[in-house]
Amino acid sequence: MFKSGFISIIGRPNVGKSTLTNEILGEKLSIVSCRPQTTRNNIRAVLTRDDYQLVFLDTPGIHKPRHKLGEYMVKAAETSTDEVDLIVFITTPEGEISKGDELILEGLKNSKKPVFLVINKIDENPQELVAKTLKQYSEYMDFAEIIPISARKSKNVDTLLELMIKYMPEGPKYYPEDMITDVQERFVVSEIIREKALKLLSEEVPHGIAVEIISMKQSKRGTYHIDANLLCEKDSHKGIIIGKGGQKLKTISTYARQDIEKFLDAKVNLKVWVKVKKEWRDSNFMLKELGYKE
């Protein structure tokens, strides 16, 4: 019997949704950063084995939006639960139920789909706090399964995966066996560049940045030549991103190129420029150009 289905992974920003997706797949598809709200699109990732296929939707964190990009991110996350077979709600040990989690759980209480509670980052918190969190959430609503994990250290992730498969219906292969994501290569490349920028830049810049792939061509010898714009909203941010003598931008580009080469399994020649696009997060035109809106 072949089982298949769709799984929505939801939660507040920075609870480890992307880390979990990447750990399950063994591939770096979703952007991972210590800063919240780094995932901006629903990333559809595919895990295929001999007897099952799981399709994961790694969603943006649900939060109170402050601009049009934020509105898009929240809408993308909320609509991801409409047509799935299983909802995986992720949180972290905090003892009390946060207002952000309460908002999400209220929307899940009447769901006809099974909902898993996954408590992530148990390796970073005292057992007493983990136990208190489990008690608080299990009393708040009924969950199909409750699994404490550490996505970063892969603790209990295999157990979670086994339970996911258990809840999947019998079904077809929705995607080819060798397919791991339905997003275009250009999108993954842009996300890799953005991830490196998020990790290397100061707090004041990151959420105002985006990456625009201008050109991506493969030569006859197999080398990819990629030109990209790293967009920011303020002139002052441009200098921070470039850094003294261009060193910061060079570091971002070097780290990004290394990961892009792993993803494409080919040599990469990457050129990145910094451009100022004021208030791009509130521009419908720019959001469409960058692929955040249809």
Swiss-Prot record:
Residue numbers spanned by region G3: 58-61
- Subunit composition and interactions: Monomer.
GO cellular component terms, alphabetically, are:
cytosol; plasma membrane
Q: What is this protein called?
A: GTPase Era
Membrane topology note: Peripheral membrane protein
Transmembrane domains' residue ranges: none
Q: Which family would the database say this protein is a member of?
A: Belongs to the TRAFAC class TrmE-Era-EngA-EngB-Septin-like GTPase superfamily. Era GTPase family.
Q: Which residues form the Era-type G domain?
A: 3-170
Where the record annotates domain KH type-2, the positions are 201-278
Location in the cell: Cytoplasm; Cell membrane
Q: Where is this region: G2?
A: 37-41
Q: What InterPro entries does the annotation carry?
A: G_ERA_dom, GTP-bd, GTPase_Era-like, KH_dom-like_a/b, KH_dom_type_2, KH_sf_prok-type, P-loop_NTPase, Small_GTP-bd
- Spell out the residue ranges making up region: G4: 120-123
Annotated stretches, region: G5: 149-151
Per UniProt, what is one GO molecular function of this protein?
Answer: GTP binding
Q: What does this protein do?
A: An essential GTPase that binds both GDP and GTP, with rapid nucleotide exchange. Plays a role in 16S rRNA processing and 30S ribosomal subunit biogenesis and possibly also in cell cycle regulation and energy metabolism.
Q: Does the keyword Transmembrane helix apply?
A: no
Task: Give the start-end ranges of region G1.
Answer: 11-18
Which UniProt keyword terms apply here? Cell membrane, Cytoplasm, GTP-binding, Membrane, Nucleotide-binding, Ribosome biogenesis, RNA-binding, rRNA-binding
User: Which GO biological process entries does UniProt record here?
Assistant: ribosomal small subunit assembly
